[in-house]
Amino acid sequence: MDLRKSPLYSKYIESNAKLVDFAGWEMPISFSGLIKEHESVRSSAGLFDISHMGVISVKGINPKDYIQKFFPTNLYSFSEGQGLYTVMLNDKGGIIDDLIIYDLGIQENDITELLLIVNASRYEEDFQWIKNNLNKDEISITNFKKAKVLLALQGKKSFDLFEEWIDSSISHIPNFGCEYKIFEHISPKEKIFFSKTGYTGENGLEILLSKKAAINLWDFSISKNVAPCGLGARDTLRLEAGMHLYGQDINEETSPYEAGLGWLVHLENNHEFFGRRFLEEQSRLGIQKKLVGLFIEGKAIGRKGCTVLKGEENIGTITSGSWSPTKQQAIAFAYINTSHALINNEVQVLIRGKKFKGVITKRAFYKKNY
């Protein structure tokens, strides 16, 4: 099967990017090298093409009323011009996807529009799960992205760079805030969507725009010495920041409580949602495993599937692992038996038949200091 290509594919070729198959898309794993790209984001700014991700539009009168049942988080806890990170659950409380929902407000004829930014590998599952569990007359569900480009400008200088590009201030927009507006000097008739969000632990923006406007932003960024970045750096940045990767750290067999996402479950809101009974039971009885962070001694990397031991007892499994360019240390996430999931608990990680010392830590290995 032919791989899907981003509208910016020609820019990858110009930049000699190394390309890989990711969720059916031919995407750059790196441009100048993972470490260099990672450090560019941590020190100044980097630009990612994340057009492989899905964007679902949900329209209707009070659409939150209809889609609330898919999410354990109270959808009325955010309003127009804001975004909300949450998880979509199956009927057993397992995570179908983690995503961000944006409220674009009332557009026309009292119709409110919500945008759901979902993982590339889960777009079809998400779309069908919503569609199959809603009355078609209640609400409109469509693929919003179509031929558009989704870019992520990330790093401590990202806000200044974006303000220069749009020739306008964004200081009034809070974190997880968004706007959907026309910038005449960029694309006179095009509404550009952008939000103060990201997947790196730094300040950042995610921008949905036409191919023409995206090329404009790409070229502008390169002219300002912003590093084009690939999926490799995106993975190490998100791991340092303590952010989950769907299919590795979370899936339909893991619950929000197990994944350290219990703060997204608003049982006190009393709204019905898929999996509520299972999560009520977990809240009452506790969980058997918990996602934690690990520092691993030496330079060996604990990859997905590596066993975590306490003495000779198998107490867990690594889900994600990498060398941390910022910490200069091997780091990982692992699901650990709850009784052993204690901060500073010393464990062993089995890597290629050898045991390496590990120490359980909080899942966020890095936090920005500005």
Swiss-Prot record:
InterPro entries: GCS_T (IPR006223), GCS_T_bac (IPR022903), GCST_C (IPR013977), GCV_T_N (IPR006222), GcvT/YgfZ/DmdA (IPR028896), GcvT/YgfZ_C (IPR029043), TrmE/GcvT_dom1 (IPR027266). It is an enzyme of class 2 (transferase). GO terms for molecular function: aminomethyltransferase activity; transaminase activity. This is Aminomethyltransferase. NCBIfam families: gcvT, PRK00389.1. It comes from Prochlorococcus marinus (strain MIT 9301). GO terms for cellular component: cytosol; glycine cleavage complex. The glycine cleavage system is composed of four proteins: P, T, L and H. Gene3D superfamilies: Aminomethyltransferase beta-barrel domains, Aminomethyltransferase fragment, Probable tRNA modification gtpase trme, domain 1. Keywords: Aminotransferase, Transferase. The glycine cleavage system catalyzes the degradation of glycine. Its EC number is 2.1.2.10. Transmembrane segments: none annotated. The keyword Transferase applies. It holds the Pfam family GCV_T. Belongs to the GcvT family. GO terms for biological process: glycine decarboxylation via glycine cleavage system. It catalyses: N(6)-[(R)-S(8)-aminomethyldihydrolipoyl]-L-lysyl-[protein] + (6S)-5,6,7,8-tetrahydrofolate = N(6)-[(R)-dihydrolipoyl]-L-lysyl-[protein] + (6R)-5,10-methylene-5,6,7,8-tetrahydrofolate + NH4(+).
